[in-house]
Design a protein with these regions (language model features):
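C-terminal motif of bacterial Sec signal peptides marking the signal peptidase cleavage site
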Residues: 26-29
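Active-site-proximal beta-strand/loop segments in catalytic clefts of secreted hydrolases
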Residues: 80, 112-114, 132-134, 143-147, ...
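Acidic/histidine-rich catalytic neighborhood of metal-dependent amide-processing enzymes
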Residues: 156-265, 285
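Active-site-adjacent substrate-binding region
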Residues: 56, 64, 92, 115-117, ...
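N-terminal secretory signal peptides that target proteins for export/translocation
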Residues: 1-13
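N-terminal capping segment at the start of a domain
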Residues: 49-95, 310-324
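Short, low-complexity, disordered segments immediately C-terminal to signal peptides
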Residues: 31-54
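A non-catalytic alpha/beta surface segment that caps or lines the substrate-entry region
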Residues: 66, 75-135
């Protein structure tokens, strides 16, 4: 993944959150007592509101959590990493393409192929889209990139967390969607290609002036442009991105470059499943696969843990290996992603983009 900014701000501490909560409860209790004394019925609670002030009415509790097999997802991850580095244009890159396709046999799959003109020359790019139809009019996109950093192609860098963990996550989500009729929106799983910059992007002591701005996100930018041209973009209700979600010390950032109301839905899904302590403890601004869709007015949420080791020390280094990842982290993010989809299915209408 590539970063616009690594600015992070800490959310209020737990102690302050408890104090604020206690004050709010005290005020609510006083209002309730006042209404009761006057023989009035307390007003119903207002719907949750996002940081822009737009009201968001969430579906009620939807029952048992969705299934997600984290051990199987972890096995997919290990098999992807076993191919070795998978930079754009390399033999291992093609092997991972074929591996993903082999796990989607029998599913409706669209191949989006084109040639990208990059600072390193022209390269074939291959986006893979698995489509699971629903009864409601609209599409929820769940995305992950699968390539590894091109400048590190001659090292042992395998991108276990960056590109590997999220690609494995989507394969297991496909298992949970497969063969189960959907009453909600259609879900399209996208393994997008050529996300990483072809030139050094400032990580690992490389020159910061080598910016990602015109040298990354090739696959997802092409897809956003294509879907804008053929009318698909208007049908997309939400774009959910997973990136760097396998860290054993999982802390998903609140991305300030995402859509506030959709991030709030993700937070609600985490809360319902008891995983809220792993979400939104920090704010961040991330330039990631969702940006081309955000720019075109699609509601987006980037689920990313951009603290991979102390001060993100393992990111874009050969130390990004499977031993630092956990099936439990895959379980948390996979379950929250599926619960988010369930909540979105029941929200009618969805907030404005």
């Amino acid at each position: 993944m590539v970063a616009i900014s690594r600015t992070r701000t800490r959310a209020p501490s737990k102690s302050w959150r408890w104090i604020l909560l206690a004050c709010m409860l005290a005020v609510l209790a006083c209002d309730h007592d006042k209404d009761a004394a006057q023989g009035q019925t307390p007003a119903p609670a207002a719907p949750a509101a996002d940081t822009t002030g737009a009201a968001v009415t969430l579906a009620p509790d939807l029952g048992p959590p969705p299934a997600f097999d984290s051990d199987r997802a972890m096995q997919y991850l290990k098999e992807i990493v076993k191919f070795g580095p998978r930079p754009l244009g390399g033999a291992n890159h093609k092997k991972v393409e074929d591996y993903i396709a082999s796990r989607l046999k029998g599913d409706p799959v669209e191949d989006d192929n084109f040639t990208a003109d990059t600072p390193e020359g022209k390269f074939p790019v291959h986006n893979i889209i698995a489509k699971f139809p629903g009864k409601k009019d609209g599409i929820i996109v769940v995305a992950s990139h699968y390539d590894t950093n091109y400048p590190l192609r001659r090292t042992s860098y395998v991108g276990a967390n960056d590109g590997g963990s999220s690609s494995a996550l989507l394969l297991e989500i496909a298992n949970q969607l497969r063969g189960r009729p959907r009453d909600g929106y259609s879900v399209w799983l996208v393994w997008d290609d050529a996300e990483e910059a072809m030139k050094p992007d400032g990580s690992g002591g490389l020159p910061q002036e080598m910016s990602f701005k015109d040298d990354s996100l090739y696959g997802v930018t092409h897809l956003a442009e294509k879907w804008q041209g053929d009318g698909t973009l208007k049908k997309i209700k939400a774009f959910l991105l997973a990136d760097m979600i396998g860290d054993a010390d999982l802390n998903i950032d609140r991305d300030l470059n995402s859509t506030p109301w959709l991030e709030n839905v993700v937070g609600e899904a985490a809360k319902r499943l008891g995983y809220q302590s792993h979400f939104f403890g920090h704010n961040n601004e991330v330039g990631d696969d969702h940006i081309p869709f955000m720019k075109r007015g699609v509601a987006c949420a980037d689920l990313i843990d951009f603290t991979y080791g102390y001060n993100n020390v393992f990111w874009h280094t050969p130390q990004d290996t499977v031993d630092k990842l956990s099936p439990q982290s895959l379980q948390i993010v996979g379950s929250v992603m599926l619960e988010t989809i369930r909540i979105l299915d029941k929200m009618d209408p969805l907030p404005p983009r």
